[in-house]
């Protein structure tokens, strides 16, 4: 359960980083 939770959280964080990256790229352009 805890492992699954941490894995899910990690995935969400990674997705958030990617979204932030895309957002910053859009702002730069």
Swiss-Prot record:
<comment type="similarity">
    <text>Belongs to the CRISP family.</text>
</comment>
<keyword id="KW-1015">Disulfide bond</keyword>
<protein>
    <recommendedName>
        <fullName>Cysteine-rich venom protein 25-A</fullName>
    </recommendedName>
</protein>
<dbReference type="GO" id="GO:0006952">
    <property type="term" value="P:defense response"/>
</dbReference>
<keyword id="KW-0800">Toxin</keyword>
<keyword id="KW-0964">Secreted</keyword>
<dbReference type="GO" id="GO:0005576">
    <property type="term" value="C:extracellular region"/>
</dbReference>
<dbReference type="GO" id="GO:0090729">
    <property type="term" value="F:toxin activity"/>
</dbReference>
